[in-house]
Amino acid sequence: QIGYGAKIGAGLFIGHRGTVIVNGEARLGSNVNLSPGVVIGQENRGRRAGVPKIGNRVWLGSNAVVVGNIRIGNDVLIAPNSYVNFDVPDHSIVIGNPARVIHRENATAGYCHNLVDESVPDEEYSVTAGGER
């Protein structure tokens, strides 16, 4: 279920059959890969009220949950069953619940499929390690 109004870049890949939920106000960059059970949703109150903005070349494993007014940088791998409600810098692997971040250049190498050249500029989604946007 991808909500009407979601902004999605070129090269979206949904691997295998299964439920995928994307909030209608979410923004996804180019070459994002979604696995079964992924939820990209909103937080309704608090300092993170809102929906995620997800960068280019992001792979989300099965049952990963990404919620709130947060930014996921470029070249990020979110491991299966991870719960993410904070900004994630470029070139990172996110794992666990609660999630933790591991810096890794080429984090999505070998994971992202259906790559296309027509991508949104990385600067549009970049997040530095200090959380600056």
Locations of the language-model features?
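Structural signal for interior beta-strand "rungs" in well-ordered beta-sheet cores
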Residues: 1-95, 99-102, 107
